[in-house]
Amino acid sequence: MNLLPKSSREFGSVDYWEKFFQQRGKKAFEWYGTYLELCGVLHKYIKPREKVLVIGCGNSELSEQLYDVGYRDIVNIDISEVVIKQMKECNATRRPQMSFLKMDMTQMEFPDASFQVVLDKGTLDAVLTDEEEKTLQQVDRMLAEVGRVLQVGGRYLCISLAQAHILKKAVGHFSREGWMVRVHQVANSQDQVLEAEPQFSLPVFAFIMTKFRPVPGSALQIFELCAQEQRKPVRLESAERLAEAVQERQQYAWLCSQLRRKARLGSVSLDLCDGDTGEPRYTLHVVDSPTVKPSRDNHFAIFIIPQGRETEWLFGMDEGRKQLAASAGFRRLITVALHRGQQYESMDHIQAELSARVMELAPAGMPTQQQVPFLSVGGDIGVRTVQHQDCSPLSGDYVIEDVQGDDKRYFRRLIFLSNRNVVQSEARLLKDVSHKAQKKRKKDRKKQRPADAEDLPAAPGQSIDKSYLCCEHHKAMIAGLALLRNPELLLEIPLALLVVGLGGGSLPLFVHDHFPKSCIDAVEIDPSMLEVATQWFGFSQSDRMKVHIADGLDYIASLAGGGEARPCYDVIMFDVDSKDPTLGMSCPPPAFVEQSFLQKVKSILTPEGVFILNLVCRDLGLKDSVLAGLKAVFPLLYVRRIEGEVNEILFCQLHPEQKLATPELLETAQALERTLRKPGRGWDDTYVLSDMLKTVKIV
């Protein structure tokens, strides 16, 4: 039998409630939770000796249960004569001090300041069915009466689903009256499923509006939220922020409900925040593997990503997480990323902190009392040391951090906080610095902290392994030098390069150190990045390495002049990112691949030179357009896709006759590598130039 109204308008009609209680008979209808679910909030805000008015009491057992645990002075009112008669008959003998009155709550007959608490369980929700003028006037009369019959210091305690229009009305009304406003989420309410809505469970909230004595001229407003797991309420700056916080709790309840019902939600992620500061502490991704055959022990697992490794493909990309989940062999895997700026004591502490929350995301059909394993790499939480934080006027907030990789080597990273899952620049640290960091970690095991200035090497440049390229797209770009004529002679002849986009400086620095006759112009629009590269990534200028602080568009345009430019660069490299995340192409900015600008690039490239472009484009239509534009200016175009990333490296040349077949290209790459691998010169043994070019295709 469907006892919840099909239309919200029915909530406000006397006829509906008369019919409702006649159908229900003497069976209690515990709308919005039972006493056991609400008692924590009720006992927190109502004292046993206080005089309590319950408005819209219905046939709920709530008043009876409060009476039985010591709350004697309770008056119940309802608009339904049927229910008042029922409740009087039920309680006349067993609860003689409790009274039931048929009364309209918009026109109550009690004297002013008669009660210390007005308790409302779903009544405001039943009345405020829409925002039409007639409805709002009725609600205004109801809330005005609540304020009239309450004493100063008294509380209006309203149990509600906190729909947006209801929260707005209640908070707005009482905050204008100078009352303190608190919203308290009822513990475990997200597990309650309304009979009429089996597909969704709404969380239940308690509004606690405390009546203050009016202070003429005072504009003080107090808004607080007390989430169920918090020990103390959090003060919020405005009614709007309070509404947002409530909505976040509702959205989380919806998400949990859908995940319990095998709903296909696609990629699901959420942040778990510090209850006191509101700062994100964990980022969770829910990954389902429908192909995994269910068994008792493979329903659900939690994977803790070691600090600093959340940007790796396996943990930071949807496809990588799917691969991780499939290899782990669980129906549902939740990956957990730890945030910089937060302190984590140990894996055990993280597990204890997460256990209750992650169980709300468990899949349907998981056996009760089943142990859920916590997984990780290496068995610890990893190492992340924030070395420096600052803000660039052009790039925004950024952070320099040292992290430990899976081989126990340490890496230094530049990350823009506007896109914190992308490593902007990365360099490997030398082993002596790694050992220092390891000792520091042992010293600070009980409490992690950012490195102090005195902990840093005296000469930051000496801490960087300049022979090692961390970024796969940088390795591919260097391998593209094999397209130049006579690559085995490149160490002996002058080589002019233009690099647009400095970042941490790893790319131009590698060329500078491995090609002793090279002369490099690096163009960087953001002066802060030059400081970062110099202070933290071992970069330095010399007579062969010059940095120009300028917009790459303007710099190349000035060289191209009026179209009569003299070719001056053997190699031009674009490794420049876009600051606009809405474009579908994050590298380079669109202006860098417009045909008019590409003509300028062409004019400063030597006839046998190579133009190398790092392209990061998720919009397939836009990518096709970029490739067509490049092909129109540079007839010979190679593409090398970076596995596991969106990056594609484009090698552009001016003459089709320069084309090299794959065997010839691999042979020249091997010849170049033999030249670079000289005794006494550092070289990463895992870096094989010819491997970088095996998958190159001609467009």
Swiss-Prot record:
Summary of activators and inhibitors of this protein: Protein N-terminal methyltransferase activity is inhibited by GTP and GDP.
E.C. designation(s): 2.1.1.-
Family label: Belongs to the methyltransferase superfamily.
Enzyme class: transferase
The name this protein goes by in its record: eEF1A lysine and N-terminal methyltransferase
Involvement in disorder: METTL13 unregulation may be involved in tumorigenesis. High METTL13 expression has been observed in pancreatic and lung cancer tissues, correlates with overexpression of dimethylated elongation factor 1-alpha and is associated with poor clinical outcome. The disease mechanism involves dysregulation of mRNA translation and enhanced protein synthesis to sustain growth of malignant cells.
Impact after mutating Y16C: Found in a renal cell carcinoma sample; somatic mutation
Result for mutant: S578A: No effect on activity
GO biological process: methylation
Gene: METTL13
Keyword Membrane: no
Annotated consequence of substituting G58R: Loss of eEF1A lysine methyltransferase activity
Catalysed reaction, written as an equation: L-lysyl-[protein] + S-adenosyl-L-methionine = N(6)-methyl-L-lysyl-[protein] + S-adenosyl-L-homocysteine + H(+); N(6)-methyl-L-lysyl-[protein] + S-adenosyl-L-methionine = N(6),N(6)-dimethyl-L-lysyl-[protein] + S-adenosyl-L-homocysteine + H(+); N-terminal glycyl-L-lysyl-L-glutamyl-[protein] + 3 S-adenosyl-L-methionine = N-terminal N,N,N-trimethyl-glycyl-L-lysyl-L-glutamyl-[protein] + 3 S-adenosyl-L-homocysteine + 3 H(+)
MF terms in GO: protein-lysine N-methyltransferase activity
Quaternary structure (record): Forms a tripartite complex containing GAB1, METTL13 and SPRY2. Within the complex interacts with GAB1 and SPRY2.
Region (Disordered): 433-459
